[in-house]
Amino acid sequence: MDSFLQVQKSTIALLGFDLFSENREMWKRPYRAMNVFSIAAIFPFILAAVLHNWKNVLLLADAMVALLITILGLFKFSMILYLRRDFKRLIDKFRLLMSNEAEQGEEYAEILNAANKQDQRMCTLFRTCFLLAWALNSVLPLVRMGLSYWLAGHAEPELPFPCLFPWNIHIIRNYVLSFIWSAFASTGVVLPAVSLDTIFCSFTSNLCAFFKIAQYKVVRFKGGSLKESQATLNKVFALYQTSLDMCNDLNQCYQPIICAQFFISSLQLCMLGYLFSITFAQTEGVYYASFIATIIIQAYIYCYCGENLKTESASFEWAIYDSPWHESLGAGGASTSICRSLLISMMRAHRGFRITGYFFEANMEAFSSIVRTAMSYITMLRSFS
């Protein structure tokens, strides 16, 4: 389990946080969050660009995408600050339960190791996609300016974010400083998003591993006597209940984040889809396509992890059904007690656990709904242009 949260630890450290801090004050180096303060400072100029271009649908959509990205990045950073002690408490619970289960058998340690290795591969890929999108966002304005100058002998200054500054960016010094500020500030959007989203991914992956261990145990439980069978089952049920409690803690932390993520992702997809449909044959099309991909991946991670958690938690019902419970039962009240506990556990497991964003459940159906809603918004925007 050495790989637990390793990608997340290195990413969130760039914002000054230490996930494995011995005390609950995880934000040890606030000065590292200068990029977040920079995006907060540039926010009014992005808003000014939105208001300035409100009559031009194309420019308005471009500015609105930047505005929504900024809002989501600032919101996620504020949630990291607000929830950092809750995250520390959850991390301690995960590490303790992982240690306890790994000590009970090599097969349980293997389940946990496999889950963490797969999780870290997915989180590394997710982080790479976001960093590539950030690099493309920073480089593409220079590429467009170079092409424009080569073809027409003149280039208008462009920035990573559409901003309306009170100074003249046609002056080289002003432009260079504005460009560096915008490019640096954009990392204040990327790092909180990658950190928060991959932490969720890692938590859900390990919760699924705990549910798999509970299934493994209940399918293979055997007792020499009714008392021993009941004691073994009680330990399995305790693991399942502990996992459900941790699911509930995770859901309480992430409900507002998932709600904001899905709402803003729907708006971003509709505007980026509209911009891509207009500019797909131009250099801007590559930029918008990369952003569409990152936003879809971002929404997909929450839906995929939520779907997996629901499936694994509900599979405990079938594990009980497939278990050799009848081999450990005899006649009498103790036998009836075991049957009753098995039935109650099956009834509870039938519901599974659902990750929610207040008004909706994070699953693949919700992901399809987000994409369909975005497509309908694109049609509406095209009718206005």
Curated annotation (Swiss-Prot):
One of its GO terms (molecular function) is ionotropic olfactory receptor activity. Expressed with Orco in 40 olfactory receptor neurons in a broad area across the antenna, including both anterior and posterior faces. This expression pattern matches the distribution of the small sensilla basiconica. Expression in the antenna is observed late in antennal development at 93 hours APF. One of its GO terms (biological process) is detection of chemical stimulus involved in sensory perception of smell. It comes from the Eukaryota. GO terms for cellular component: dendrite; dendrite membrane; membrane; plasma membrane. It is a multi-pass membrane protein. Residues 55-62, 151-175, 277-284, 379-385 are extracellular. It is found in: Cell membrane. Pfam families: 7tm_6. Coiled coil: none annotated. Residues 1-33, 84-129, 197-255, 306-357 are cytoplasmic. Odorant receptor which mediates acceptance or avoidance behavior, depending on its substrates. The odorant receptor repertoire encodes a large collection of odor stimuli that vary widely in identity, intensity, and duration. Complexes with Orco to form odorant-sensing units, providing sensitive and prolonged odorant signaling and calcium permeability. They are necessary and sufficient to promote functional reconstitution of odor-evoked signaling in sensory neurons that normally respond only to carbon dioxide. Involved in the behavioral responses to esters. Belongs to the insect chemoreceptor superfamily. Heteromeric odorant receptor channel (TC 1.A.69) family. Or1a subfamily. PANTHER family: ODORANT RECEPTOR, ODORANT RECEPTOR 47A-RELATED. This is Odorant receptor 47a. The lineage of its organism: Eukaryota, Metazoa, Ecdysozoa, Arthropoda, Hexapoda.
